[in-house]
Amino acid sequence: MAQELMFEEPRRGKPPRHLADFDAEGRASAVAALGLPPFRAKQLAHQYYGRLIADPRQMTDLPAAVRDQIAETMFPNLLTAAREVTCDAGQTRKTLWRATDGVTVESVLMRYPQRNTVCISSQAGCGMACPFCATGQGGLTRNLSTAEIVEQVRAAAAALRDEFGDRLSNVVFMGLGEPLANYARVLAAVRRITEPPPTGFGISARSVTVSTVGLAPAIRKLADERLGVTLALSLHAPDDELRDTLVPVNNRWKISEALEAAHYYAEVTGRRVSVEYALIREVNDQPWRADLLGKRLHGALGPLVHVNLIPLNPTPGSDWDASPKPVEREFVKRVRAQGVSCTVRDTRGREISAACGQLAAEGG
């Protein structure tokens, strides 16, 4: 049975507040409420964002007498690793996280020769109901808090440092959920990720990607924030007739509206927009659709667009599969012939259901 679109999360209790939920002013207020001197706020932020420590009992520059109090009030254990699985010779690791209310989400850490990327979740489940995506088939449980999002990043950065002596370079909001449907918390998380220590992790905004199925008003709103992050538009079809089915939000905002919003984003930020296109055998891989995709993107975005073709990854309950390689190559050639940059994405994590469209946070 097809899922219905859900833009509002079901009513649920909120996760406990955490240091990562607060901006600088909020941290100062939280520290003052504990009766601590103002400089402790910056100290705590430095420990968390700079040293990647999430347990005040390990913060040796804090008086021992206040560590337990700070742990209880500002550092609740929001996410517990319930399961980890790896593939690609240990270069890809998927973690199933369990939140304080029992909901589960997933993140995927991918190590490459020149970069280290973590794919993070912004919601538990997803309300966008895309039929080829495991997350969309499961529906929306709730939004994640800012701190629950940020904690996925801190955990990945700490793992890279402690296990490999390496640094986290890239963050992509491509895990569970539609990031722009959880706008305020995702925006706050992006700020924590990109601001320099001691107020954030200091990851370049150009190395942070926020994906969306095409919530046009929110794309424009994000452009006006002028954060400079990369926008990834999950398009998957160049014509409204097919996209209405593949990406049901298209019934609310048509392709032309999504592309106009993407053009606005590129114009305001100067950043090239990434267009994601899952190639599905005999569904959206026809030559004429490749031609139309190239024409529409070139007309809307000119040189400020790049197409990432994604070979469809298998998901439970779906009979669709990836297009054959010759069809894939022809599709790339035709899109490029329209003057649009196009490549096939390197797929990681398929064996452990960690690839694009496979995350569902099941089990544990």
From Swiss-Prot:
It comes from Mycobacterium ulcerans (strain Agy99). Its main location: cytoplasm. NCBIfam families: rRNA_mod_RlmN. [4Fe-4S] cluster binds at residues 126, 130, 133. It is an enzyme of class 2 (transferase). S-adenosyl-L-methionine binds at residues 177-178, 211, 234-236, 313. GO terms for molecular function: 4 iron, 4 sulfur cluster binding; metal ion binding; rRNA (adenine(2503)-C2-)-methyltransferase activity; rRNA binding; tRNA (adenine(37)-C2)-methyltransferase activity; tRNA binding. This is Probable dual-specificity RNA methyltransferase RlmN. Residues 112-350 form the Radical SAM core domain. It catalyses: adenosine(2503) in 23S rRNA + 2 reduced [2Fe-2S]-[ferredoxin] + 2 S-adenosyl-L-methionine = 2-methyladenosine(2503) in 23S rRNA + 5'-deoxyadenosine + L-methionine + 2 oxidized [2Fe-2S]-[ferredoxin] + S-adenosyl-L-homocysteine; adenosine(37) in tRNA + 2 reduced [2Fe-2S]-[ferredoxin] + 2 S-adenosyl-L-methionine = 2-methyladenosine(37) in tRNA + 5'-deoxyadenosine + L-methionine + 2 oxidized [2Fe-2S]-[ferredoxin] + S-adenosyl-L-homocysteine. It comes from the Bacteria. Its cofactor is [4Fe-4S] cluster. Its EC number is 2.1.1.192. One of its GO terms (cellular component) is cytoplasm. The gene is rlmN. GO terms for biological process: rRNA base methylation; tRNA methylation. The active site is at residues 106, 356. Reaction proceeds by a ping-pong mechanism involving intermediate methylation of a conserved cysteine residue. Binds 1 [4Fe-4S] cluster. The cluster is coordinated with 3 cysteines and an exchangeable S-adenosyl-L-methionine. Specifically methylates position 2 of adenine 2503 in 23S rRNA and position 2 of adenine 37 in tRNAs. It is found in: Cytoplasm. Disulfide bonds join 119-356. InterPro entries: Aldolase_TIM (IPR013785), Methyltransferase_A (IPR040072), RNA_MTrfase_RlmN (IPR027492), rRNA_lsu_MTrfase_RlmN/Cfr (IPR004383), rSAM (IPR007197). Keywords: 4Fe-4S, Cytoplasm, Disulfide bond, Iron, Iron-sulfur, Metal-binding, Methyltransferase, rRNA processing, S-adenosyl-L-methionine, Transferase, tRNA processing. Belongs to the radical SAM superfamily. RlmN family.
